[in-house]
């Protein structure tokens, strides 16, 4: 019998060795090495948490918050170090999305078979 958790652990280990993940780690190291980029990342991270919390609680963002996020996004878009990290992050998520499609394929096939019954 297959232990799917062993397979999942191996997949996690394999992910760490992919070109996409290694590029992300390198980009993160570049952010850490640049004080301004790191501070901007931390500000962006806090802002994203604030937005998610507002969405989860159904609260509207204030005009002041919206202006802050707009300004923050403009500063992030001008920071090439952070932009490189965000592009690398996107590549990792694309890879994970592709893997998720493969993992979900048996379930999709089972439901497709049920629909045909």
Curated annotation (Swiss-Prot):
The record's InterPro entries line, in alphabetical order, gives: Com_YlbF, YheA/YmcA-like_dom_sf
Mind telling me which Pfam families this protein's record contains?
Answer: Com_YlbF
- Which intervals of the chain form a coiled coil? none
Which family is annotated?
Belongs to the UPF0342 family.
* Database matches in HAMAP family: UPF0342
Name under which the protein is recorded: UPF0342 protein Ldb1541
- Please name the source species: Lactobacillus delbrueckii subsp. bulgaricus (strain ATCC 11842 / DSM 20081 / BCRC 10696 / JCM 1002 / NBRC 13953 / NCIMB 11778 / NCTC 12712 / WDCM 00102 / Lb 14)
Q: Please name the taxonomic classification of the source.
A: Bacteria, Bacillati, Bacillota, Bacilli, Lactobacillales
């Amino acid at each position: 019998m297959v232990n799917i958790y062993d397979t999942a652990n191996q997949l996690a280990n394999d992910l760490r060795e992919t070109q996409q993940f290694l590029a992300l780690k390198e980009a993160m190291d570049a952010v850490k090495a640049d004080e301004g980029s790191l501070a901007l990342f931390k500000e962006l991270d806090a802002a994203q948490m604030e937005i998610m919390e507002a969405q989860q609680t159904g609260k509207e963002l204030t005009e002041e918050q919206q202006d802050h996020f707009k300004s923050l996004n403009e500063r992030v878009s001008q920071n090439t170090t952070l932009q490189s990290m965000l592009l690398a992050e996107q590549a990792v998520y694309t890879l994970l999305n592709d893997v998720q499609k493969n993992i979900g394929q048996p379930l999709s096939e089972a439901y497709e078979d049920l629909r045909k019954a």
